[in-house]
Each structure stands twice: as C-alpha cells, then as structure tokens.
Amino acid sequence: MDTLPPDRDLAAIGLLQDPVRRALYGHVVAAGGEVSRNQAAEAVGVQRGLAAFHLDKLVAAGLLEASFRRLGGRRGPGAGRPAKLYRRAAA
C-alpha cells in the first residue's frame, strides 16, 4: 500500500502550485548559493516586493533558508541595511 508524504511535504508541494513562487524557487535552487531579493526578482521578471513575499513564504514552509549579510565593502554606521539572502534549505 502506498503511503502519503507527511503533511509538511504536502503543504510545500501546494506552495509550488503558484507559478511565480515556483519560478523563484527554481531560480534559487539553480543558483546553487545565496540569492538576493533583487536578483531573484530580476531573474523571473517580477517586482522586488512580490518576490520578497513569495520568497518569505518559501522560507516559512522550510523550502528555503534566509540569512542577512552586507553585500558591499562598507562597514559600520552608515553602511546601510544588510541584504536578505536566500538559499535552498538543507534536506
């Protein structure tokens, strides 16, 4: 008898039904490393805010992981906010 995947896996599969979310997930996975919101948005042709919304949903589902890091060489006060970066979640 076949068994169904755990509910968490089914929920993750359901999240990928959205074409924008699926494209963003595919881009992050294909990149093989960290991807910024701007990079992901540009790659799939959507606005940054929409990309951020979908990427954060993928993080909440456990499909992606997020971290913060300054991308430029500047440090200290006035260096700006660290970028939120996404990568495929460890299995």
Give residue spans per PLM region:
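A short acidic, leucine-rich amphipathic alpha-helix
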Residues: 24, 39-43
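Key DNA-contact positions within bacterial/archaeal DNA-binding proteins
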Residues: 38, 48-49
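Short capping segments at the starts of secondary-structure elements
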Residues: 19, 31-36
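Short, hydrophobic-biased segments on the C-terminal half of alpha helices
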Residues: 55-56
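Conserved segment of winged-helix/HTH DNA-binding domains
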Residues: 73-91
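Glycine-centered, phosphate/nucleic-acid-interacting loop/turn motifs that mediate DNA/RNA or nucleotide
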Residues: 62
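Short alpha-helical segments that sit at the start of domains
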Residues: 1-23
